Amino acid sequence: MGAYDGAEAPRAAPASTAANSRPSRLLLLHSLLLRLVAVVLSILVIAVMVHAKQRVMIFKAEWDNSKAFVALVTISAICLGYSFLQFILSAFHLCSKSWKSPTKCWAWMNFIADQILTYAMLGAAAAAAELAYIAKNGSSRAQWQPICSTFNTFCTRAGASIILSFIAVLALANSSAISAYHLFRRPSSSV
C-alpha cells in the first residue's frame, strides 16, 4: 500500500503567531499610510474649495452658494476627523509592543464606518462634479448658461477640489478594503 493506507495524514503544525501577525502588521502599515493620505487630501479639498471665490463686476461666485459644494466640504471635514483619529489609533497599535489583531467588534465598526464615509465622500464628490459640469457647459433644457467663462478662477479652484476629492475617495476605498480584509479573513471560531 501507499503512504496513505487509511491512516490520517499528519496535521501541519500551526504557524507561529509572529508569522501570522506579519501580514496583519504590513496591512496595518498600509492602512496607516492610506489614512494619512486621506487626511492630507481632505485638508486640501477643504482648503481649495473654501478659496473658490470670485467677483466679476457686481456678480460673485462663492463655494457656499451651492449645497453640493457645502456638502463636499462638510463630508471632507468629517472624513478628515475620522481618518485622523484612525491614523492615530493605527499608529498606536503599530508601535505597541503588545500588538495584536483588532477584535471582531472593532473590525466591524471600522468596516462599517469606512464604508459609510467612502460612499458619502463619493456621493458628495459626484454631486459637486455634476454642479461643476453644469457650471462649465450650462443646461439647455433648464436654460442655464455656462458661467465658467466669466468665473474662470472660481471654476478652476472648484474643479481642483473635486479632483482631489475623487483621489481621496480612492484612498478611503482602499482603506475600506483593508478593513474588510481584517474583518472577513477571520475564522468563525474567533467571533
Curated annotation (Swiss-Prot):
Homodimer and heterodimers. The chain crosses the membrane at residues 26-46, 69-89, 115-135, 158-178. Residues 47-68, 136-157 are extracellular. Keywords: Cell membrane, Glycoprotein, Membrane, Transmembrane, Transmembrane helix. NCBIfam families: A_tha_TIGR01569. Signal peptide: none annotated. Glycans are attached at residue 137. The keyword DNA-binding does not apply. Residues 1-25, 90-114, 179-191 are cytoplasmic. This is CASP-like protein 2U4. It comes from Selaginella moellendorffii (Spikemoss). GO terms for cellular component: plasma membrane. The lineage of its organism: Eukaryota, Viridiplantae, Streptophyta, Embryophyta, Tracheophyta.
